[in-house]
């Protein structure tokens, strides 16, 4: 069995390749931009960090926001690829609410050299400022982390 560091390195390369392919196939995606995110999760209890890319509206106010999150703690490293869609509610204020969800692929690497790949689904709600700052709450079902509280920034 390969060392954990090698497996993580290979997985991260695959995940980044998938994310780059998603970005490369979208012609108008540059209109919205990339972003960074971080926060805490419950079950597993972890700190997480990652990145995302938000597309322009696909229809009405529905955006595609795929993201990659890496969680550390609770004797496991979690790498999640989330294929999330968000609907942004109309607002005249500097803050706007949004809600959404989407499927996830979760890679779990345990301290005892075991690993698992599980599918999941996330539901999310959040608030974003027009400048790009956002706060988000995710609820995971199936085999996604149960709850995530996050903050992030989308570069516009």
Give the location of each predicted region:
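Cleavable N-terminal export/targeting peptides
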Residues: 1-32
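Residue-level marker for the onset of beta-strands and adjacent loop->beta junctions
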Residues: 11-12, 19, 49, 121-123
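Residues that define the transmembrane beta-barrel architecture of outer-membrane proteins
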Residues: 32, 45-49, 75-81, 95, ...
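Transmembrane beta-strand segments that form the barrel wall of outer-membrane beta-barrel proteins
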Residues: 32-42, 61-72, 99-107, 132-142
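Outer-membrane beta-barrel architecture
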Residues: 37, 50-54, 84-86, 124-128, ...
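Gram-negative (and chloroplast) outer-membrane scaffold detector with strong preference
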Residues: 50-113, 155-156
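Hydrophobic alpha-helical segments of small multi-pass membrane proteins
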Residues: 100-105, 119-127
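A charged, solvent-exposed segment within the mature domains of Sec-exported extracytoplasmic proteins
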Residues: 122-156
């Amino acid at each position: 069995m390969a060392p954990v560091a090698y497996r993580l390195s290979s997985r991260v390369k695959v995940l980044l390749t998938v994310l780059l392919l998603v970005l490369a196939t979208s012609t108008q995606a540059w209109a919205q931009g990339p972003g960074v995110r971080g926060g805490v999760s419950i079950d597993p209890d972890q700190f997480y960090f990652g990145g995302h890319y938000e597309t322009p509206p696909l229809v009405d106010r529905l955006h595609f926001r795929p993201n990659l999150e890496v969680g550390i703690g609770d004797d496991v490293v979690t790498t999640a690829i989330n294929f999330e869609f968000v609907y942004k509610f109309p607002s005249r204020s500097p803050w706007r609410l949004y809600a959404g969800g989407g499927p996830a692929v979760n890679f779990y690497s345990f301290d005892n050299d075991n690993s698992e790949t599980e599918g999941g689904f996330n539901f999310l709600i959040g608030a974003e400022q027009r400048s790009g700052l956002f706060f988000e709450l995710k609820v995971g079902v199936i085999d996604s982390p149960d709850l995530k509280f996050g903050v992030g920034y989308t570069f516009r």
